[in-house]
């Protein structure tokens, strides 16, 4: 019982071990298909405790063992909160030139087949993160202080962990009572000292575009983005030492349906509610640009993660055999894996050559029919029940269905490609296999 698994990571042992000691490491290694959340990270790999939340109100408390702490060779943790024997030893040894043999030894009554997909995911994720980090450091080795709005959302949580494991300091800007290390942010009237000591801002906050496009909903979508962004950009302009102002944006700026037209950052904006909102959203960054701050608008495609967005909605349908293409399935889907989006945000902060709008999409868009076939194949389920066109209209209304569910946008990441940016998951099959722990299948 239990499992021992090894792989070689293309980074030296000190760097691999050090990565595990940084805040956010445990968040980066939790498989996205598992209903697990980090409640508290361990303050130390020698004797700290990490607490994870599980379904049903259960908690997984991993207590690190002082007797096994041997940097940079090993550390171990044991489960203390549940009646399940569990000891997880993490071992690191040199392997050739500037590489590390990483070995996980899990001692538990659970069979290896239950553990394998999780452990394989952790190794692949660790390798990918360290490879991407090496590329980021080739751009800039600076360690920055980055203020982040929307840090508790799907993207913000993952991005915070990526930045902190990269050696940066993250200052969450929050609208509730701030905890240690956070700052209170009033979107309509931010405090003059909010950005003091900050090198860069990543502004993610904004109301979800999901749901029916009622007048009230459209007002919330617009007002949660444009005015708060302008106020934050004005504050950035008045703050000494700020190097970069990076804001979320969306490919909705190109309009809901441009046929087979290839859309790049140089393409004209489209028509429709979302195009109007995104244009105003991007224009709201003007005060920062006018002050000489490098400003980047990350025009985000359809983010792929089982933890949120479209994929979270589709997964249960496909797992029960009820998934299928939407209408005729000819709509273009400009998708992006979550980790690739995070890498783009990190690059936007670090790369002095990057400014203005940047399409954050994978280099290979797919049609809706191809997307649904691929998802079904990865989940090993059929995709034989097409969703009629009126289905999204029932849920989202005519305008919402046209602008979201039925949108067709052939968007390419021309500026990133021109900059030599490397994607972790450039094609859909590999991305979905990684996200669902189906690599090698």
Describe the residue ranges of each PLM region.
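Conserved Rossmann-fold NAD(P)-dependent oxidoreductase catalytic core, especially the SDR/UDP-sugar
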Residues: 230-272
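Mid/C-terminal beta-alpha module of Rossmann-like enzyme folds, strongest
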Residues: 143-144, 351-399, 433, 439-440
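NAD(P)-dependent short-chain dehydrogenase/reductase
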Residues: 289, 297, 301-332
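Alpha-helical substrate-binding/gating segment
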Residues: 315-324, 330-365
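Hydrophobic ligand-binding cavity/cleft-lining segments
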Residues: 1-43
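Hydrophobic-ligand binding "helix-grip"
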Residues: 27, 32-35, 41-109
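NAD(P)H-binding glycine-rich loop region in Rossmannoid oxidoreductase-like domains
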Residues: 183-228
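N-terminal Rossmann NAD(P)H-binding glycine-rich loop of SDR-like oxidoreductase domains
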Residues: 144-166
């Amino acid at each position: 019982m239990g499992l021992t698994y090894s792989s070689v990571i293309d980074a030296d042992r000190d760097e691999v071990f050090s990565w595990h000691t940084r805040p956010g490491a445990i968040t980066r290694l939790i498989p996205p298909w598992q209903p697990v959340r980090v409640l508290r990270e361990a303050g130390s790999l020698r004797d700290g405790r990490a607490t994870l939340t599980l379904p049903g109100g259960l908690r997984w408390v991993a207590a690190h063992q002082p007797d096994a702490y041997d940097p940079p060779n090993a550390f171990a943790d044991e489960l203390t909160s549940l009646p399940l024997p569990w000891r997880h030893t993490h071992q690191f040894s040199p392997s050739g030139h500037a590489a590390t043999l990483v070995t996980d030894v899990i001692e538990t009554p659970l069979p290896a087949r239950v553990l394998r997909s999780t452990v394989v995911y952790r190794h692949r994720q660790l390798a990918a993160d360290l490879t991407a980090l090496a590329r980021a450091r080739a751009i800039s080795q600076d360690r920055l202080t980055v203020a982040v709005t929307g840090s508790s959302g799907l993207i913000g949580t993952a991005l915070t962990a990526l930045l902190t494991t990269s050696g940066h300091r993250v200052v969450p800007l929050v609208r509730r009572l701030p905890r240690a290390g956070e700052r209170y942010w009033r979107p309509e009237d931010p405090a003059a000292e909010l950005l003091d000591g900050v090198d860069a801002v990543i502004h993610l906050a904004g109301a979800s575009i999901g749901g029916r496009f009622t007048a009230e909903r459209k007002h919330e979508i617009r007002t949660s983005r444009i005015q708060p962004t302008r106020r934050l950009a004005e504050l950035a302009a008045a703050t000494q030492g700020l190097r970069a102002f990076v804001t979320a944006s969306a490919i909705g700026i190109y309009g809901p349906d441009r046929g087979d037209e290839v859309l790049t950052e140089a393409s004209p904006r489209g028509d429709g509610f979302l195009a109007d909102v995104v244009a105003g959203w991007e224009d709201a960054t003007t005060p920062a640009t006018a002050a000489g701050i490098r400003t980047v608008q990350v025009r985000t495609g359809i983010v792929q993660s089982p933890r949120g967005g479209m994929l979270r909605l589709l997964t249960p349908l496909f797992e029960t055999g009820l998934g299928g293409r939407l209408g005729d399935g000819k709509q273009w889907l400009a998708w992006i894996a979550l980790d690739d989006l995070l890498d783009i945000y990190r690059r936007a902060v670090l790369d002095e050559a990057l400014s203005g709008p940047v399409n954050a999409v994978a280099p290979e868009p797919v049609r809706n029919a191809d997307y649904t076939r691929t998802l079904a194949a990865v989940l090993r389920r059929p995709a034989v029940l097409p969703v009629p066109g009126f289905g999204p209209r029932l849920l989202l209304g005519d305008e919402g269905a046209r602008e979201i569910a039925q949108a067709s946008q052939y968007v390419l990441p021309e500026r990133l490609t021109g900059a030599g940016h490397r994607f972790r998951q450039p094609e859909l099959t590999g991305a979905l296999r990684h996200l669902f722990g189906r690599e090698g299948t």
